[in-house]
Amino acid sequence: MVFFPHRHLIGIKGLTEQDITYLLDKADEAVKISRQREKKTSTLRGLTQINLFFEASTRTQASFELAGKRLGADVMNMSVGNSSVKKGETLIDTAMTLNAMRPDVLVIRHSSAGAAALLAQKVSCSVVNAGDGQHEHPTQALLDALTIRRAKGKLSRIIVAICGDVLHSRVARSNILLLNAMGARVRVVAPATLLPAGIADMGVEVFHSMKEGLKDADVVMMLRLQRERMSGAFVPSVREYYHFYGLDAETLKAAKEDALVMHPGPMNRGVEIASEVADGPQSVIAEQVEMGVAVRMAVMETLLVSQNQGPRTDGLKA
């Protein structure tokens, strides 16, 4: 019996509501394991996970590493800075070299959109996209959804306002796809210069005012101003951006009283979010980090168990 009909996790696009629910239910079980004193299982014993990060990462790489190790996999982190890539080797050559080592899953983060999909075409193991350019970041969307569902009890019919640098955000794209698939009502709030062309065609409501966009929102998801991906002047100044699009306690009052405050990290305090909000009672930013490990455990077991020998008795229950 195939529990999950996909060999890879390249993006949220292509996943059904049932696929997403399956992964979230599986992740709920992983949360229980992560909160035990004895956190390690033997579910993926004897299997190998290679983390291939071409972009700097702290949270995501550590989260994937911890997820694999808690499931008993052998985990290798490849340092791109010291690799053959720096000597001119192409992504395909690197992929073929690693594939010859017979890993069971490759986790890749790359600055180019489509890198994970390309890798999946060239290797015989499963591939998980840990972020590819401005395209997608599927496990971030899944962990955000898990955080919301555990706090609100559902994803359907809730209002989620995604605010900030939507243009450069793969997190925004994956969240929009997932939340729409699960029946949520999605808003984006940003200056016109930080919205991609055709954003309204993705099934979202577009706002240019924080007060209007946050009105009656159940969830406020702030995005980092990604200045490293900007080649021009997208905002007049950081100070002006914060004045109009930063989230402080006063601005948050426009949302529902019990609205969740989220941020995928890393945060720029005083740029898109005030410390009083990031550290406040409505913030679930720390919970997002915890849910990240659980979601990645669920993804790893789902892909590797489906691909290999079927469910083991000590695995996660969905």
Curated annotation (Swiss-Prot):
PROSITE patterns on file: CARBAMOYLTRANSFERASE (PS00097)
Pfam families per the UniProt record, alphabetical: OTCace, OTCace_N
One MF annotation (Gene Ontology) recorded for this entry: amino acid binding
Entry GO CC: cytosol
EC number: 2.1.3.2
Binding site for L-aspartate: 87, 170, 224
Entry keywords, A to Z: Pyrimidine biosynthesis, Transferase
Pathway(s) this gene product operates in, as recorded in its UniProt entry: Pyrimidine metabolism; UMP biosynthesis via de novo pathway; (S)-dihydroorotate from bicarbonate: step 2/3
SUPFAM superfamilies named in the record: Aspartate/ornithine carbamoyltransferase (SSF53671)
Superkingdom classification of source: Bacteria
Cited InterPro entries: Asp/Orn_carbamoyltranf_P-bd, Asp/Orn_carbamoylTrfase, Asp/Orn_carbamoylTrfase_sf, Asp_carbamoyltransf, Asp_carbamoyltransf_Asp/Orn-bd
Enzyme class: transferase
Membership in a protein family: Belongs to the aspartate/ornithine carbamoyltransferase superfamily. ATCase family.
Record's function text: Catalyzes the condensation of carbamoyl phosphate and aspartate to form carbamoyl aspartate and inorganic phosphate, the committed step in the de novo pyrimidine nucleotide biosynthesis pathway.
Record note on quaternary structure: Heterododecamer (2C3:3R2) of six catalytic PyrB chains organized as two trimers (C3), and six regulatory PyrI chains organized as three dimers (R2).
Stated name of the protein: Aspartate carbamoyltransferase catalytic subunit
Organism listed in the record: Rhizobium leguminosarum bv. trifolii (strain WSM2304)
Gene that specifies this protein: pyrB
